[in-house]
């Protein structure tokens, strides 16, 4: 299975903020959308960073309430690790596990195509495992 399969199922909608927005504004977006990370896009819609709950936590740990006034650019993770739609789900799982992150933007030739989360990957893998188990059950039954 490939990243393109996940995007084909879940869609390619991306939630993004700008580098100039405040951390408070980005937190409001995360909360309203009930998500754990937002992509950071510049005025040309180019991916320049990713802002995760962990990034926010580290900023608040360092600056307390003052962190809320920081610009997203001061807190975001950059450079961004990305994946390609032709990458396998197994490869993406390995990237996420080794990098200790839960969201990967999907990019091809500098064009942002979507984002996959660890939840998307785990769900896809569980569904795949269930399908394999059903095929084996049917094979054994015949």
Task: Kindly give the residue locations of the regions a language model identified.
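Structured interaction and signal-relay segments at domain junctions
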Residues: 54-64
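Bateman/CBS regulatory modules and CBS-like beta-alpha motifs in cytosolic regions of diverse proteins
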Residues: 1-29, 35, 40-43, 47-48, ...
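Residue-level recognition of oxygen-bearing side chains
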Residues: 22, 56, 88, 117, ...
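Juxtadomain coupling helices with adjacent low-complexity linkers
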Residues: 122-142
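C-terminal structural segments of small proteins and small subunits
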Residues: 102-104, 112-113, 119-129
């Amino acid at each position: 299975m490939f990243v393109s399969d996940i995007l084909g199922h879940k869609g390619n909608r991306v939630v993004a903020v700008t580098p100039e927005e405040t951390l408070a504004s980005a937190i409001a977006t995360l909360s309203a959308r009930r998500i754990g990370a937002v992509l950071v896009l510049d005025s040309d819609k180019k991916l320049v960073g990713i802002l995760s709950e962990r990034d926010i936590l580290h900023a608040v740990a360092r600056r307390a309430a003052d962190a809320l006034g920081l610009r997203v650019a001061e807190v975001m993770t950059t450079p961004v690790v990305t994946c390609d739609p032709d990458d396998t789900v197994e490869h993406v799982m390995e990237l996420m596990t080794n990098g200790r992150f839960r969201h990967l933007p999907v990019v091809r030739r500098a064009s942002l195509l979507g984002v996959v989360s660890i939840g998307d990957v785990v769900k896809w893998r569980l569904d795949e495992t269930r399908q394999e188990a059903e095929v084996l059950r049917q094979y054994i039954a015949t």
